[in-house]
C-alpha cells in the first residue's frame, strides 16, 4: 500500500502551515511534520476510519483537522485535510 497526496491535499497542508505559523512561529512546521507523519500511518491503517460523503475520514489528534481519503486498489489517495472548526456545509462543498 502506498499513499498519494493529491494537489488539493498539498495545498491544505501549506495553508494550514501558514495559518499555524501566524499563531506562533514554528508551529506551522510542526503542523506539516505531524500531518505527513499521520499520512504515513495510512499505509497500515487505511480503510478503518469512518466514511463520510464517500471518503474515509481520519480525525487528527493534535490539531483540529481531518484527513479525507479514498482507497483505490493498493493506493491511498489523500484528497483534503480540512479544519474541523469549519461549517459542515462548507466542508461538504470541498469534497
Put a short name on every predicted segment:
Residues 2-56, 72-75, 94-95:
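Basic, Lys/Arg-enriched alpha-helical interface segments
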Residues 66, 70-95:
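Enriched for short, Lys/Arg-rich terminal
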Residues 59-62:
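A short catalytic or substrate-binding loop motif that flags glycine-/basic-rich loops and adjacent residues
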Amino acid at each position: 500500500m502506498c499513499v498519494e497526496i493529491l494537489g488539493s491535499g498539498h495545498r491544505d497542508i501549506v495553508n494550514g502551515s501558514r495559518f499555524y505559523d501566524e499563531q506562533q512561529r514554528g508551529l506551522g512546521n510542526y503542523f506539516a511534520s505531524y500531518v505527513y507523519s499521520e499520512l504515513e500511518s495510512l499505509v497500515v491503517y487505511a480503510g478503518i476510519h469512518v466514511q463520510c460523503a464517500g471518503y474515509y475520514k481520519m480525525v487528527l489528534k493534535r490539531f483540529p483537522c481531518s484527513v479525507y481519503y479514498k482507497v483505490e486498489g493498493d493506493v491511498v489517495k489523500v484528497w483534503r485535510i480540512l479544519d474541523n472548526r469549519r461549517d459542515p456545509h462548507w466542508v461538504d462543498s470541498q469534497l
